Design a protein with these regions (language model features):
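A solvent-exposed, charged loop/short amphipathic helix patch at secondary-structure junctions
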Residues: 20-51, 100-128, 346-355, 432-445
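Conserved SAM/AdoMet-binding glycine-rich loop
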Residues: 255-377, 383-388
Length: 457
């Protein structure tokens, strides 16, 4: 297939965040007392390049790159700072987005607090507004946007037309991306918004392995989630776990590219290989033994408190394997609420295999085990969920008191309508109550308490 295709992302995504994914959350903040150039250098410096091509790139972009190469396209992934060098001959440009308008929970919360637009929204717009892209559009370049953040375009309906975006792809694109880019390089009309249904999601054997390194060695170990929380969009996707050899092959690609460590990515790493909410001891241990043998360091993207609490002995065994080469590791976790009543309403299966009304105890047990085994969680709370009552907020404040001795960061995030709750109202700053302010203060106090120890690790 002919046609030159470029893939890129804005500079807040084309960074390795100084080899700390947690620093990537700095892109969610708006401009502040730190000068912009210094803030960028501190939190999202540009990735290393070889001849204008990044030595690593966001994992989702690498998957699309692999699929297009598999289908015979001429494709290059380029850094935004080096687009000018390659875009002259390009017929189509694919752009990966995570939080293009700063409407995600973390960025919208920080935007409210600091009253400014987040960096990630500013740099996405600046990318599309760059002279090289504007010039390429005039000669017929097609722009295709995809990634986890495309849902935000529904709140900015005129943006795509204003900035010359020809097609927005929503969902897992492996099955369709080839035909859309083929139409683009042929100069054909593209669908303005292409939504991929659950039925059209790729099967395991249809998902290609990455062929070039991903940022910070991140590799997917599975897709989808079986818990069905109403506020989450991932749970709308079918659950699939990659076989270990597929995961290890992608780790080899990253190691060959200079990434000695890896981030195992799934919505719940503890459930690797399981088709329900009970961890599979054999598969989880076998995977970690193989990964630690290859890598200098391992961390997780996400895991569930219920999965940890369900199998304390298994979790301790996994921790022992991981800590052979490192003193600690991290993961993002969803605490969401301290209220059993709210848990029953918006996330009845999040506590499985325990009952929803046991949720506060599940949180305390899971986080206690993490503390004992040196997993340092970055926990999130939902502020302003639909049907939230004052009593629910009080219960969450009480839970924060119970967690004060757990080594962790806990971040309150304003409710954003996603998943099955996408028709609900956004939580607005005018809805902030004294109780909400008390909860935010508790989280800040908790973070300050643990900051010194976490920085020293």
């Amino acid at each position: 297939l002919g046609g030159r295709i470029l893939l890129t992302a804005d500079c807040t995504l084309m960074s390795d965040y100084r080899h700390s994914e947690f620093l990537g959350f700095g892109t969610c903040a708006p401009p502040n007392f730190i000068p912009d150039f210094l803030y960028k250098w501190l939190f999202f410096p540009p990735i290393n390049n070889q001849k204008g091509l990044p030595t690593s790139a966001p994992y989702g972009l690498r998957k699309i790159e692999a699929q297009l190469l598999k289908e015979g396209f001429s494709v290059k992934t380029v850094s935004p700072d080096n687009l000018r060098k390659y875009i002259v001959q390009a017929q189509a440009l694919g752009i990966h987005v995570m939080d293009p308008f700063g409407l995600g929970p973390a960025s919208s919360t920080l935007a409210f607090i600091l009253k400014k637009e987040p960096f990630l929204a500013q740099y996405f717009r600046a990318l599309l507004d760059s002279p090289e892209i504007r010039d390429a559009k005039k000669r017929g370049l097609k722009i295709i946007v995809g990634g986890p953040g495309v849902w935000q375009f529904q709140y900015r309906p005129k943006f795509a037309e204003k900035y010359g975006i020809d097609c927005i792809i929503s969902g897992e694109a492996e099955r369709v991306v080839g035909k859309i880019f083929q139409a683009a390089v042929r100069g054909q009309q593209l669908p303005q918004y292409y939504e991929i249904s659950v039925e059209d999601a790729p099967k395991l054997e249809e998902i290609p392995d990455i062929v070039c390194p991903s940022v910070n060695g991140l590799v997917e170990i599975g897709r989808g989630c079986c818990r069905g929380c109403s506020f989450c969009s991932v749970t709308l996707r079918p659950l699939r776990w990659y076989p270990a050899d597929k995961i290890l092959h992608e780790i080899d690609v990253n190691i060959a590219g200079g990434n000695a460590g890896t981030i195992l990515h799934a919505e719940d790493v503890m459930l690797y290989g399981s088709n329900n909410t009970i961890p599979d001891d054999k598969k989880l241990l076998k995977l970690h033994q193989a990964v630690v043998k290859k890598c200098e360091g391992v961390t997780w993207s996400h895991c569930s408190l219920a999965g940890v609490a369900a199998k304390p002995k298994l979790f301790a065994q996994v921790a022992e394997i991981i800590r052979q080469k490192q003193s600690w590791w991290g993961a993002e976790i969803g605490i969401e609420t301290g209220s059993p009543e709210l848990a029953k309403k918006i996330m009845p299966a999040k506590a499985n295999p325990f009952k929803a009304e046991e949720w506060p105890q599940v949180v305390k047990t899971g986080m206690g085990l993490m503390h004992d085994n040196w997993l340092i969680p970055a926990g999130t709370l939902i502020v302003g969920a639909p049907e939230e009552t004052e009593e629910d907020v009080i219960k969450t404040i009480e839970l924060m008191d119970d967690l004060k001795d757990v080594r962790s960061l806990i971040v309150p995030l304003f409710f954003v309508p996603m998943g099955r709750l996408k028709g609900e109202e956004w939580f607005k700053e005018t809805q902030m109550t004294n109780l909400h302010q008390e909860l935010l203060a508790k989280c800040l106090e908790h973070g300050i308490r643990w900051a010194d120890e976490l920085i020293d690790l």
